[in-house]
A protein has these predicted regions:
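Short, surface-exposed, charged/polar-biased interaction segments
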Residues: 28-30, 208, 252
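Mg2+/Mn2+-dependent nuclease catalytic core
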Residues: 130-244
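Generic preference for flexible, low-structure residues
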Residues: 81, 85, 215-218, 247, ...
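DEDD superfamily 3′-5′ metal-dependent exonuclease/proofreading module
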Residues: 2, 100, 155, 240-252
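Metal-dependent nuclease catalytic cores that hydrolyze phosphodiester bonds in DNA/RNA
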Residues: 1-146
Length: 252
């Protein structure tokens, strides 16, 4: 068991892994190196206070949905779906993390979870959960990163896949989710390095507030390798930004 500590450096989230080093989180790498022009235009249009409120609500609903998914998929999935739902709802009612949110976030997060439950393209494809909410890190040639993967499961077709859960206000187009693909790829390769298990691919599940049917984007292992190389380019750029900030004595 490794001693892991979350630390704040240069205004960003890093993880200190005892004996290995200090690594930026995957989300820190992506948020720092991504194109922020669209977000900045949106903030200017709606105002800073409104932007913060919307972002906070999105984070809260996502946290609630993630917890419902974690509870549901942490059960013996060989049970019938009605029994699984009954048990998971009983656990959710008593869950301290879910109960820390306001009723609006709890209701919306549960509604988004139920969209996955009500569509047979999602839970029925999973044979069993290998692990979920697992801390991972990767390091090679003085480059490294860390983060927590949502879910890694054995599917009924025999494949093992990283599954990442997302929420959205409206449906996503494939060309809008590049960072999601990079994130799944980073976690997949970290699983391979840390646990010696080569994932067969990845999936991105997105529940949005408009459609009853969530979206599923599927990545092959060949695509994961491709996107991992792109992620490593972003990681190298992040390290350049970090060095510049350290030299200037400012936050990233």
């Amino acid at each position: 068991m490794y001693n892991i500590k979350r630390v704040n450096l240069l205004g960003k989230r890093f993880y200190e892994v005892d004996g290995f080093g200090v690594f930026p989180s995957v989300t820190t790498v992506l948020s720092t190196t991504g194109d922020k022009s669209g977000i900045e235009r949106w903030k200017k249009r709606v105002g800073q206070d409104e932007a913060e409120r919307i972002a906070r609500e999105a984070t809260d609903r996502g946290s609630v949905m993630h917890k419902h998914l974690e509870i549901y998929l942490g059960q013996d999935l060989k049970q019938d779906k009605q029994s699984l739902l009954k048990s998971s709802k009983e656990q959710a009612v008593a869950d301290t993390e879910i109960n820390s949110f306001n009723n609006k976030a709890k209701d919306l997060g549960e509604d988004l979870f139920m969209k996955f439950y009500n569509n047979d393209n999602f839970f029925p494809s999973i044979e069993s959960t290998i692990f979920q909410e697992k801390f991972l890190w990767f390091n090679k040639s003085n480059l490294g990163y860390a983060g927590t993967v949502d879910n890694f499961s054995l599917l009924k077709d025999g494949s093992r896949k990283v599954i990442d859960f997302k929420t959205a206000k409206k449906p996503k187009q494939d060309n809008w989710i590049m960072d999601y693909k990079l994130q799944v790829s980073a976690y997949s390769i970290a699983i391979w390095q840390r646990h010696g298990i080569k994932p067969d691919g990845g999936e991105i599940w997105i529940a949005n507030e408009i459609d009853d049917v969530p979206q599923k984007f599927v990545l092959s292992f060949e695509e994961i390798r491709f996107f991992f190389e792109l992620f490593m380019q972003r990681l190298k750029r992040f390290e350049e930004i970090k060095r510049e900030a350290e030299a200037a004595g400012v936050n990233i």
